[in-house]
């Protein structure tokens, strides 16, 4: 029989703009910050009892190489005896880390774990593959910030290798999502995030980051990506994929930096370490879709999860849907029978306003859902997101 698994604490860094306040911080140092914050916030815990640290990270081609989870836990001050593993489900890596920890504890294999994710897209390197032959002049430099690199010709022939904005336009075309609706969705995200920031909502989940530089140091304590915009300003932006398309920089998520970490524990570990159970993890489900419309992935993932749990989408008091693109966000909501402007969906804005540090975002969605449930007294929360190469992931929690 599966055991109950609890989220006991959750913290993250601010989300930095591309080239912004966190751009000089290495990914391993960035990932260590929320782990260290968890240690400081929970002095009653015997940290030598942590069974594993699970961190999501999508890139792993630069300073986040060689198992960034292990690097981060050591840099954070956890004992050398604690193992760590880095998971990669691209955009959903941080959520997958939470789900993997949940399953390990629920099965009885583990009692106490840290899970989360990290991404420094500002510091993503350029990489070059090795030559296929001596004196080759066909060397190619690849940008690892986001999207395809070192493309497999068979993959391209069978499925296509559309860039992320193209997949979003594919969804807009297939599901008839207009430019006007996308821009309205994007504006709502910005407005809700601005209101949440003004109310201090995100301060509860953020650990400020001190960034050293030549002139001293800077304290980064707020998410940097939100923009003050209008429908008129959004309407003036040119489509990324040509005049007849609808996806723009304004109705898409950002390229960002950030890290997050959560404590997950069994009921026994909660008592043993003096923790407070804040939410119960109910389950996680994944699903695959055509890579060319990867943005629709949350639909089958959510349907699979709610069927498994015996719930309906209407049972959730808050839904954190990752806003990779407004087009896919709207298509997902409509397929699930949810209104475009439903108040329970991203009530504090989403990735269009906050940003989308790939490996961190899934963990951010879960903790933001938790904080919203605690703020409003709601019971059940759902976090879901699309994944590059055609997948969806969904995870449900219940406040205790």
PLM region descriptions:
Residues 1-76, 167-179, 196, 289, ...:
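Conserved active-site "lid/cap" helical segment
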Residues 1-25, 146, 231-296, 300, ...:
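Condensing-enzyme catalytic core mediating Claisen C-C bond formation in acyl metabolism
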Residues 25, 57-113, 142-148, 158-164, ...:
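Conserved catalytic cysteine-centered active-site region
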Residues 88-119, 172-201, 261-268, 333-334, ...:
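Active-site-proximal alpha-helical scaffold in enzymes
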Residues 112-170:
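Flexible glycine-/small-residue-enriched beta->alpha junction loops
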């Amino acid at each position: 029989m599966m055991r109950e698994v609890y989220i006991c604490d959750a913290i993250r860094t601010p989300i930095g703009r591309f080239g912004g306040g966190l751009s000089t911080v290495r990914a391993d140092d960035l990932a260590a910050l929320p782990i260290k914050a968890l240690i400081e916030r929970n002095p009653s815990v015997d940290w030598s009892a942590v069974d594993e640290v699970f961190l999501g990270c999508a890139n792993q081609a630069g300073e986040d190489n060689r198992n960034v989870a292990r690097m981060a836990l050591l840099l954070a001050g956890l004992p050398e005896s604690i193992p760590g593993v880095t998971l990669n489900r691209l955009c959903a890596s941080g959520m997958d880390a939470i789900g993997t920890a949940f399953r390990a504890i629920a099965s009885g294999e583990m009692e106490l774990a840290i899970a989360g994710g990290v991404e420094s897209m500002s510091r993503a390197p350029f990489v070059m593959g090795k030559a296929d032959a001596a004196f080759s002049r066909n060397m190619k430099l690849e940008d690892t910030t986001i999207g395809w690199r070192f493309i497999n010709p068979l993959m391209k022939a069978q499925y296509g290798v559309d860039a992320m904005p193209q997949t979003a336009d594919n969804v807009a075309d297939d599901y008839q999502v207009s430019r006007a609706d996308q821009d309205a969705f994007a504006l709502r995200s910005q407005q809700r995030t601005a209101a949440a920031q003004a109310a201090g909502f995100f301060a509860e989940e953020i650990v400020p980051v001190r960034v050293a530089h030549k002139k001293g140091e800077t304290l980064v304590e707020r998410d940097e990506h939100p923009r003050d915009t209008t429908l008129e300003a959004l309407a003036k932006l040119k489509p990324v994929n040509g005049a007849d398309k609808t996806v723009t920089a304004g109705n898409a998520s950002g390229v960002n930096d950030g890290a997050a970490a959560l404590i997950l524990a069994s009921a026994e570990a909660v008592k043993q370490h003096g923790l407070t159970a804040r939410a119960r993890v109910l389950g996680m489900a994944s699903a695959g879709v055509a890579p060319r419309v990867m943005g629709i992935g949350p639909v089958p993932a959510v349907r699979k999860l709610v069927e498994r749990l015996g719930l309906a989408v209407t049972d959730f008091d808050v839904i954190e849907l990752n806003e990779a693109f407004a087009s896919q966000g709207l298509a997902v909501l409509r397929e699930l029978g949810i209104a475009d402007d439903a108040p329970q969906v991203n009530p504090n804005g989403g990735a269009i306003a906050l940003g989308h540090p790939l490996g961190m975002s899934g963990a951010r969605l879960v903790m933001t859902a938790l904080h919203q449930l605690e703020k409003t007294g709601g019971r059940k929360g759902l976090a879901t997101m699309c994944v590059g190469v055609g997948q969806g992931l969904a995870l449900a929690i219940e406040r205790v």
